[in-house]
Amino acid sequence: MFEYLGTVLTAVDPGFDVLRYLTVRTIGGTLTALVISILLGPTIINFLKSMQFEQFVREDGPKSHYKKTGTPTMGGLLILSSLTISTLLWADLGNRYIWVVLGVTIGFALIGFFDDYLKIRKKSSDGLTSMQKIIFQSIIALISMTYLYYSAEIMPETSFIVPFFKDLILPMSPFIFIFTGMFVLIGSSNAVNLTDGLDGLAILPTVLIGGALGLIAYAMGNQLIADYLFLPHLPLSGELIVFCGALIGSGIGFLWYNTYPAQVFMGDIGSLTLGAILGIIAIILRHELVFAIMAGVFVVETLSVAIQVISYKTRGKRVFLMAPIHHHYELKGWAEPKIIVRFWIVTLVLILIALATLKLR
């Protein structure tokens, strides 16, 4: 909205052109989402409590989690409301990438909402079945990937960018583009969902990765920076930094209430959606491999579950005390805050390594 106002009001006074600057709108979007998130926090938390939308704690989980019983869940509503409002205010709504990301956000939020609702109604950890979630996620992913491929205006939008190599861009067929995109989008969504098991564990890595993807989006949207880094120039990608800024603001605002000991949990409406958001942005920017490096913590959490299941079904033995791996460290006696902060640190290091690939070519 403000971008449009800047365009209109510049005819009256050139000073209003500042509303069109990406940097100004990114800062504005970040601060707006942060303020909305912090101010709405108590209201949404009280609403969730009044509706008895409370976290169910599994009896076979770590005993330290019993004290979390009764903590309101579905706090992802706080993240998504502040994120969406801020994006609509500060982003260029004529940019098709913004609408793709918002569409994915809404679609995965609906899946997460119904999953949370069923868990609350049943008072168990069983919401939608795994197959139901995969089917719904696949439908949204298929629509998104198909649109991205056939709406592409330049070759790099549908190509595979190989890290560490200059100008190594591999064209992709419709099938490969859509299939790999669906894999990344669904995988990212479920990876963040698996990671969201401790207070603040998932939200700060999401914020940090979102910020890093925003920098890549800005670089690829700027011809001079893209040429300097030997990146393909995607003229529309720069606008995604405004969305990433709103993601940072809403995420930090949520962390204010989600930090240990948490006053609210994001629920599947938050974790499934945030993972999908990161995935779709990485796909649009054609930096799926770089994203995999950044999201190493999410990847390891997912692999730990896969390894545990495969090992138990084939050998009858468990590799970890409990999966995902953050529960393994809990059962080894690590304090919850120590696990959380160390995973944050690992994420920060991985992001720095991933960003280094932009120049090491």
Where do the protein language model's features map onto the residues?
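Membrane-interface helix-loop junction between the first two transmembrane segments
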Residues: 42-60
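Membrane-interfacial loop-to-helix junctions in multi-pass inner-membrane proteins
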Residues: 94-102, 121-136
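Alpha-helical transmembrane segments
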Residues: 2-43, 84-96, 100-110, 144, ...
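Membrane interface segments of multi-pass transport proteins and intramembrane proteases
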Residues: 119-129, 163-172
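Select subsegments of transmembrane alpha-helices in polytopic membrane proteins
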Residues: 68-80, 132-140, 336-346
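Juxtamembrane helix-loop transition segments at the membrane interface in multi-pass membrane proteins
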Residues: 51-53, 123, 269
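Juxtamembrane helix-capping/reentrant segments at transmembrane boundaries
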Residues: 57-71, 125-133, 326, 331
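Alpha-helical transmembrane segments within multi-pass membrane transporters and channels
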Residues: 110-117
